[in-house]
Design a protein with these regions (language model features):
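Interfacial transmembrane-helix boundary/kink motif in multi-pass membrane proteins
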Residues: 2-25, 48-51, 73-105, 296-321
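Alpha-helical transmembrane segments in multi-pass membrane proteins
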Residues: 21-70, 266-276, 336-340
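Alpha-helical transmembrane segments of multipass membrane proteins
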Residues: 25-34, 60-64, 97-105, 223, ...
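Hydrophobic alpha-helical transmembrane segments of integral membrane proteins
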Residues: 29-30, 59-60, 95-96, 143-144, ...
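Short helix-terminus and kink motifs of transmembrane alpha helices
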Residues: 38, 102-109, 155-156, 160, ...
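Juxtamembrane helix-loop-helix connectors linking adjacent transmembrane helices
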Residues: 41-52, 75-146, 164, 325-340
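Membrane-water interface of transmembrane alpha-helices
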Residues: 62-73, 107-111, 276-294
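Transmembrane helix-loop-helix hairpins at the membrane interface
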Residues: 133-339
């Protein structure tokens, strides 16, 4: 009996269902510790909190693993190796986009401040000292686990499900948007979207998730190092004897000072713009000199690629939009989710 090969539209629909289920699963994992029970964790050390964060990230990959097992996809395809030069270039890109990301976050923080919003401060344990163990736990959660999990799900399974159904440019945009909205942070929307699009481009162009993993690791590690330095400098400048602590989870949200528009513009022109140009040059070179991946462009006729295939994607975006709206309502004080 000949093996039945599913239509590309069926693969697209199945991947949309994965996106929907993963969104619900991820929200269930992070909603309670982020909003509803934030004060319940005040007795835990930053080390424990970052280990909890790493555990949640590992749990979030379960839907993708089950999806791969049920659909009998080969991990050797999803985890296809990349050339060493591609991985190195990916890491370099991840480093270059950090100043651009910070500048976008500054501009966004300025916009939120000018429109009456307030940046949410993450819950911080009151007494523990910033130790090597805490930094190591943060590194494990942010620089190792998060890039591996997110790249496998987004740039591996979800992006691959769009091959043969959508043009490459549309697939890059769709995956980048989904990645951004799953973070659920309005203040970081422009910077996360920029990073998500760059990561997706690297995966599509190289045909492997490893350049995007390298970029993701370099990006997160750079932000972590900057935050540790900022904590140390702030501690030295403060007259209080208590040591600084690392906010769990470590994010740029809540650490970005409000700037006026002129200051934000200066930051962009003097710091971020040269890095943005450099990033563009590196990405152009990556595109120009990387071997083509054989991305499956859509065929002329795709049976069943209408609403039956697209509704899971629409549902996933609706769920994530509601999740993002929760953050907006919190930012502007319309509702109070974090208890005082």
């Amino acid at each position: 009996m000949p093996k039945t090969i599913p239509h590309e539209s069926g693969r697209f629909r199945d991947t949309g269902l994965l996106a929907l289920f993963s969104s619900l699963w991820l929200i269930a994992l992070v909603l309670v510790p982020r909003y509803l029970l934030v004060n319940q964790f005040s007795a835990l050390s930053p080390t424990v909190l970052n280990l909890i964060s790493a555990g949640l990230e590992l749990f979030s990959v379960l839907p993708a693993i089950l999806f791969v097992a049920i659909k009998r996809q080969q991990l050797s395809v999803l985890l296809r190796p990349a050339e060493a030069g591609q991985v190195v270039a990916g890491g370099f890109v991840g480093f270059l986009i950090v100043p651009v990301s910070i500048a976008l976050s500054l501009v966004m923080a300025t916009f939120i401040s000018m429109t009456g919003g307030n940046m949410i401060q993450e819950a911080v344990a009151e007494s523990p000292r910033l130790t090597a163990g805490q930094v190591a736990a943060a590194f494990l959660a942010i620089s190792v686990v998060a890039p591996l999990v997110e790249e496998f799900e987004f740039r591996g399974v979800i992006l691959r499900g769009q091959a043969g159904v959508l043009p490459r440019s549309v697939a890059v945009l769709l995956t980048g948007m989904l990645f951004t909205m799953e973070h659920g942070r309005f203040a970081g929307f422009p910077s996360i979207l920029m990073g998500g699009l760059v990561l997706t481009f690297l995966a599509v162009r190289s045909g492997s998730i490893w350049p995007s993993v390298a970029a993701h690791c370099a990006y997160n590690t750079s932000l972590l190092i900057l935050q540790v330095i900022a904590a140390f400098v702030s501690q030295q400048a403060s007259s209080w004897p208590e040591p600084m602590v690392l906010p769990p989870p470590v994010t740029m949200d809540g650490l970005i000072p409000s700037l006026d528009l002129a200051a934000a513009t200066i930051v962009w022109l003097c710091i971020a713009l040269p890095y943005a140009v450099s990033t563009g040059v590196v990405l152009w070179a990556f595109h120009r000199y990387t071997r083509k991946t054989g991305w499956e462009e859509p065929h002329a006729a795709q049976p069943g690629t209408g609403l039956r295939a697209a509704w899971p994607w629409a549902a996933a975006f609706a769920v994530l939009l509601a999740y993002l709206a929760l953050d907006v309502l919190q930012l502007y004080g319309i509702i109070e989710i974090i208890p005082k």
